[in-house]
């Protein structure tokens, strides 16, 4: 259960987890922009799985921050 209430924008109600998802997506984008030039993806077996796991870890950390 999050500390933030449901937010209503133009008649659409957004649960607090929606904003946590957006924040984790923004951080994921920044982390990917840093990791690609460093060449880490050359050592990754399956980049799509790596990206999915990275996003899940970031979302978990951010959602734990707001609880």
UniProtKB/Swiss-Prot annotation:
Its main location: membrane. The keyword Transmembrane helix applies. It comes from the Bacteria. It is a multi-pass membrane protein. The chain crosses the membrane at residues 3-23, 47-67. It is found in: Cell membrane. The keyword Transmembrane helix applies. GO terms for cellular component: plasma membrane. Keywords: Cell membrane, Membrane, Transmembrane, Transmembrane helix. It holds the Pfam family DUF1656. Induction: Positively coregulated with aaeA and aaeB by AaeR. Belongs to the AaeX family. NCBIfam families: PRK11594.1. This is Protein AaeX. The gene is aaeX.
